């Protein structure tokens, strides 16, 4: 088995933005709070971090800043995937140079590559990387599913160490665990499937929920690992209404609204994303009040 990047919960952290750019003062506050609350790792410039609307310079600077702010206290995983393999390689090399502990490589989107194309793209990026690579399968966003058979081929690469599985397809994830569970780590990419994926041998979750509940999300994982499966199950189900509210509009619109309500950023997202509808936001805030988050 390859070295595990992290065990437990990693926050797919929002990027605090204003009309003028990234708000690094608020970003620092959010990172510090995450670490104080016991998060196990931080993923910067992922889907939730609005990487797709950051400029190239902002993307690189956000990675560098996060690594510097965290200062080795927890692993930092940089989102460096792209539908342009050459650019993914450029970002991946940069992340390694500035000290990221690993990179997260989303399946190339829009191009609708064949499985052979996915294999060649991920291999090329992993070959160029100085740090471990985590694959990221999210077909609802990319229009392209990374099949278990393809992951089994990629799992033979020494630098590909894990996969974030956000397909939502438990049958596919079970097949994945059967094929590669002894070769690479599997992380849930969906907050409503943390415990089910842990039960298949998963090592944790790359989470949206942990933007606002890092301690509880980490505890859910560690309760399971420590044998308190009933406690983990209860947390999973108790937090389900809040999880659903965080996905009632496309991520990261609700996550940004929630983090904003806690005072860590402005409720600002870049077009084509728009801020949360008032009725949905009020439902989210009501659930947050019930959890004493605001």
Where are these regions (language model features)?
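Alpha-helix N-capping/helix-start residues
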Residues: 19, 24, 56, 148, ...
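Active-site beta->alpha loop and helix N-cap motifs at the rims of alpha/beta catalytic domains
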Residues: 2-11, 15-143
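Catalytic alpha/beta core domains of metabolic enzymes, predominantly
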Residues: 127, 141-247
């Amino acid at each position: 088995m390859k070295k595990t990047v992290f065990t437990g919960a990693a926050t797919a952290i929002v990027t605090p933005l204003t009309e003028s750019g990234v708000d690094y003062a608020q970003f620092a506050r959010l990172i510090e709070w995450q670490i104080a609350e016991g998060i196990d790792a931080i993923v910067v410039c992922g889907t939730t971090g609005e990487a797709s609307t950051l400029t190239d310079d902002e993307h690189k600077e956000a990675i560098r800043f996060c690594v510097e702010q965290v200062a080795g206290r927890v692993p930092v995983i940089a989102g460096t995937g792209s539908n342009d393999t050459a650019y993914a390689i450029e970002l991946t090399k940069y992340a390694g140079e500035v000290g990221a502990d690993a990179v997260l490589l989303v399946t190339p989107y829009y191009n609708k590559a064949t499985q052979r194309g996915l294999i060649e793209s991920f291999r090329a990026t992993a070959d160029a990387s100085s740090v471990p690579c985590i694959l990221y399968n999210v077909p609802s966003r990319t229009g392209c599913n990374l099949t278990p058979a393809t992951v089994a081929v990629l799992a033979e690469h020494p630098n590909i160490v894990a996969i974030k599985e956000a397909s939502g397809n438990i049958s596919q994830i079970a097949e994945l665990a059967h094929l590669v569970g002894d070769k690479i780590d599997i992380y849930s990419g969906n907050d409503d499937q943390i415990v089910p994926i842990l039960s298949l041998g998963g090592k944790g979750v790359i989470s949206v929920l942990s933007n606002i509940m890092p301690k509880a999300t980490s505890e859910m994982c560690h309760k399971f690992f420590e044998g308190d499966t009933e406690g983990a199950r209860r947390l999973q189900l108790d937090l389900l209404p809040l999880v659903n509210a965080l996905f009632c509009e496309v991520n990261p619109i609700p996550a940004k609204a929630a983090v904003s309500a806690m005072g860590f950023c402005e409720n600002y997202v870049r077009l084509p994303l728009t801020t949360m509808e008032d009725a949905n936001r009020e439902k989210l805030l009501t659930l947050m009040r019930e959890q004493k988050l605001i």
